[in-house]
Amino acid sequence: MAEENVIYVGNKPVTNYVLAVMTQFSEGADEVKLVARGRAISRAVDVAEFIRNNVMPEVEVKDIEIGTEEIETEEGDTISVSTIAITLAKPSE
């Protein structure tokens, strides 16, 4: 998947990310990957479900990857942050 088809979910409203996904699909992308860490994970799930249930019901969840990233703080400690990557795909015709 091309890097331009990846949307990093952060603190913006869900509608911003829904619009970004719709834009990617309208520009010809077959797949779009939503990537989030920490507190933004629930927002990424909300975006995927909003797209599937309200905007583009033909879109399918192709893959969900979960994991943990080790991040070093300014104090030198290491903390673990949960991650998720949700791949949405248009059905093949």
Curated annotation (Swiss-Prot):
Q: What one GO molecular function would you report for this record?
A: RNA binding
- Say if the entry is tagged with keyword Cytoplasm: yes
Gene Ontology biological process: chromosome condensation
Q: Where in the cell is it found?
A: Cytoplasm; Chromosome
Which InterPro entries does the UniProt record give? Alba-like_dom_sf, DNA/RNA-bd_Alba, DNA/RNA-bd_Alba-like
What are the entry keywords?
Chromosome, Cytoplasm, DNA condensation, DNA-binding
Q: What is the first-listed, main subcellular location in coarse terms?
A: cytoplasm
Alphabetized Pfam families for the sequence: Alba
KW DNA-binding (keyword) present: yes
**One GO term of the cellular component aspect?**
chromosome
What role does this protein play? Binds double-stranded DNA tightly but without sequence specificity. Involved in DNA compaction.
Checking NCBIfam families in the record gives: DNA-binding protein Alba, PRK04015.1
Family, as annotated? Belongs to the histone-like Alba family.
> What name appears for this protein in its UniProt entry?
DNA/RNA-binding protein Alba 2
**Gene that this sequence comes from:** albA2
